[in-house]
């Protein structure tokens, strides 16, 4: 087998592979002979069909199968021979496949960059120290009362905490867009649910009033067809309703599923939830800090094929069609996020390799059981379904390995305690989920 490799652009490689004809022809003949002993054809006894008859009937199919398998086998062999590490799947272009001649094909692909993780001694991480206070509990209980409020229609101008029921219809440059209209939409003023333009327009509005609201969508919106564009909404106010909050008593606790212990048991349940939220938020804040700084400390040339694949995944997650060529103007909306994910993925994988980090099976099983318990199904059935879902299991393995890498990184870098309130922790951008 002869192999030659040329660099196309950046990390791109074009590998030409020539395979001796004997490797293909010998395998074709072997399979045809094997088939002649098994195939049933009219006019011949079982196992006595001549090879030339089998070749005439099945030769093209057998040859196609052999060519496909030989290409797969020799592609892997050629990569090993040339010490190449491809990033993603290759594009295979056959050059010669004729009977009796050497097989020749070209494989085009990106290779992984050479990576030596550096700068760990320059990473400084703030480790949040957060105490759950009685005031935090009171804030949550007040939010629960508001969430379970009854609303009563009132004949006055709308104000904060009122529920305003509206019909709206929006257009961009006179054209409708996905999600542009709704009827009887209930909106709570002052709850942070609404764009600022809607808040300003609805404050002080009364039932029966019609108004026009303009809203500019964020440039970084995941849906590129409306990102950065201004929509004009025609709004009709149908009702203004004020909240009637329930009393914080044992009956209210029972409404929330606390059958014994009343308000005190409810407070303990809320505290437990806040403790879990605190743990998760602290972890995500640490993870975001260490991964962001890891990326900043290491400059990498990124394989274009991996970025393209990540962009396609982001488009699918946003509900956009992932088919067809992506215009450059829309590509830029995804490219920064996609590049960050690819970069962190490469760095994490290199740390897994260089530090010999092995999948923690016990940690993975714990996460599996938590997923099953939170699925809303019978936990044992849910566990079995998840375990049989290969894609989900691969995603879970990658997530657990990534968490193990974060653990290792946090042991290497400099950390400093920082006291925060619970609200400061939960409202910080650093508390958002980070992922490679």
UniProtKB/Swiss-Prot annotation:
Documented EC number(s): 5.2.1.8
Location (main, coarse): cytoplasm
Gene Ontology CC terms? cytoplasm
Which reaction(s) are listed as its catalytic activity?
Answer: [protein]-peptidylproline (omega=180) = [protein]-peptidylproline (omega=0)
An MF annotation (GO) of this entry: peptidyl-prolyl cis-trans isomerase activity
Chain intervals for the UniProt region annotation (Disordered): 1-26, 81-100
What does this protein do, in the record's words?
Involved in protein export. Acts as a chaperone by maintaining the newly synthesized protein in an open conformation. Functions as a peptidyl-prolyl cis-trans isomerase.
How are the domains described in the entry? Consists of 3 domains; the N-terminus binds the ribosome, the middle domain has PPIase activity, while the C-terminus has intrinsic chaperone activity on its own.
Q: What is this protein called?
A: Trigger factor
- Its gene is tig
């Amino acid at each position: 087998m002869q192999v030659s490799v040329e660099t196309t652009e950046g990390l791109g490689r074009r590998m030409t592979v020539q395979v001796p004809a004997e490797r293909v022809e010998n395998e074709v003949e072997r399979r045809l002979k094997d088939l002649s002993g098994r195939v049933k054809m009219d006019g011949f006894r079982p196992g006595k069909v001549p090879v030339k008859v089998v070749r005439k009937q099945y030769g093209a199919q057998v040859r196609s199968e052999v060519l496909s398998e030989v290409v797969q086998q020799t592609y892997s062999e050629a990569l090993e021979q040339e010490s190449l590490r491809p990033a993603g799947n290759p594009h295979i272009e056959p050059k010669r496949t004729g009977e009796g001649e050497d097989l020749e094909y070209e494989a085009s692909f990106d290779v992984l960059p050479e990576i030596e993780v550096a700068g760990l001694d320059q990473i400084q991480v703030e480790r949040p120290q957060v105490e759950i206070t009685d005031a935090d509990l009171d804030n949550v209980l007040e939010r629960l009362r508001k969430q379970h409020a009854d609303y009563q229609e009132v004949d006055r101008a709308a104000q904060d905490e009122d529920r305003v029921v509206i019909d709206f219809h929006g257009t961009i440059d006179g054209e409708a867009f996905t999600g542009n209209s709704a009827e009887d939409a209930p909106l709570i003023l002052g709850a942070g649910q609404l764009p600022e333009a809607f808040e300003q327009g609805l404050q002080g509005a009364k039932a029966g009033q019609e108004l026009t609201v303009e809203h500019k969508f964020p440039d970084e919106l995941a849906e590129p067809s409306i990102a950065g564009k201004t929509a004009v909404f025609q709004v009709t106010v149908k009702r203004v309703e004020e909240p009637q909050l329930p009393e914080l008593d044992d009956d209210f606790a029972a409404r929330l599923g606390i059958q014994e212990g009343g308000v005190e048991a409810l407070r303990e349940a809320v505290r437990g939830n806040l403790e879990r939220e605190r743990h998760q938020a602290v972890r995500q804040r640490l993870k975001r800090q260490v991964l962001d700084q890891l990326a900043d400390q290491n400059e990498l040339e990124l394989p274009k094929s991996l970025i393209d694949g990540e962009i396609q995944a982001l488009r699918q997650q946003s509900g956009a069609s992932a088919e067809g060529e992506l215009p450059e103007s829309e590509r830029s909306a995804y490219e920064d996020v996609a590049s960050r994910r690819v970069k962190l993925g490469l760095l994490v994988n290199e740390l897994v390799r260089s530090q010999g980090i092995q999948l923690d099976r016990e940690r993975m099983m714990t996460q599996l059981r938590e997923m099953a318990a939170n699925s809303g199904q019978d936990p044992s059935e849910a566990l079995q379904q998840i375990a049989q879902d290969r894609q989900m299991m691969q995603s879970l393995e990658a997530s657990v390995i990534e968490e193990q890498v974060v653990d290792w990184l946090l042991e290497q870098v400099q950390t400093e305690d920082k006291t925060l309130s619970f609200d400061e922790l939960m409202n910080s951008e650093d508390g958002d989920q980070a992922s490679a």
